Regions:
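Patatin-like phospholipase
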Residues: 2-185
C-alpha cells in the first residue's frame, strides 16, 4: 500500500506518457491556445500516437508477475484485441508466463496512444471502451458477491444479472475526478 501511495503522490504525466508536464497542466487548466492544441495533436498523430513507454517502465519496475501468479487470488483483466477485433476476458492463468506486463499496458492503451504490438505481435487496447465495468465476467466465473469500485470513466457498461443469493456493493467518488489521464485532482 505504501508503495502505491508513493507512486500516486509522485505521479506526473511524464511518468505515464512521453509528454511535457507543464504543457499538459496548462492544457487541463484551459490555458493552452486552440492553435497550440491543434499543432500538438497533429504532431502526436504524425508520430503514431501518444508514447506510453514511461508507463511500460513504471509497470516493469513495480509489478512482480511471480508474486501475482503465486498469491492465490484470481486476477482478471479485459482488453480489446485490435488484431482480432474481439473482447478478451482473461484471468492471469490465461496470460502466458512473462507477458503480464504486456497485458497490463494494453489495459492502459486508449485510442490515440501509440499502440506497440505485444510479444505475440498482436495489438490490444483497454477493454473499458467496450466493457467499462466487467462485473459480468466475475458473475460468469461463479462469483456471487461483488464489490464494484467505480471511477465513472467513458465506455459501455453492460447490465449484470446477479444470482438470487448475490449482492453487489458499489463504491464511487462523490465528486468528479476529471479526465482519466489527469493526475492532479
Amino acid at each position: 500500500l505504501e508503495k502505491a501511495e508513493k507512486i500516486w503522490s509522485e505521479m506526473e504525466f511524464s511518468r505515464v506518457m512521453s509528454v511535457d508536464d507543464d504543457w499538459m497542466r496548462q492544457f487541463f487548466q484551459g490555458e493552452q491556445k486552440l492553435g497550440d492544441i491543434l499543432a500538438e495533436l497533429g504532431r502526436v498523430f504524425r508520430d503514431g500516437g501518444v508514447d506510453a513507454a514511461p508507463l511500460r517502465k513504471l509497470i516493469h519496475e513495480n509489478v512482480d508477475e511471480e508474486k501475482i501468479r503465486g498469491c492465490g487470488k484470481e486476477f482478471f483483466i479485459v482488453t480489446f484485441s485490435l488484431t482480432d477485433m474481439k473482447e478478451l476476458e482473461l484471468s492471469v492463468s490465461d496470460i502466458p508466463e512473462g507477458r503480464l506486463e504486456d497485458f497490463l499496458l494494453a489495459c492502459a492503451y486508449l485510442v490515440g496512444f501509440k499502440n506497440e504490438p505485444m510479444g505475440d505481435g498482436k495489438r490490444d487496447i483497454d477493454g473499458g471502451i467496450f466493457n467499462n465495468v466487467p462485473a459480468d465476467v466475475l458473475v460468469e466465473k461463479g462469483y456471487t458477491d461483488l464489490i464494484e469500485i467505480r471511477i465513472y470513466g467513458p465506455g459501455r457498461e453492460p447490465r449484470v444479472s446477479l444470482p438470487e443469493d448475490g449482492e453487489m456493493y458499489q463504491i464511487g467518488p462523490r465528486v468528479k475526478l476529471g479526465s482519466i489521464i489527469e493526475f492532479d485532482r
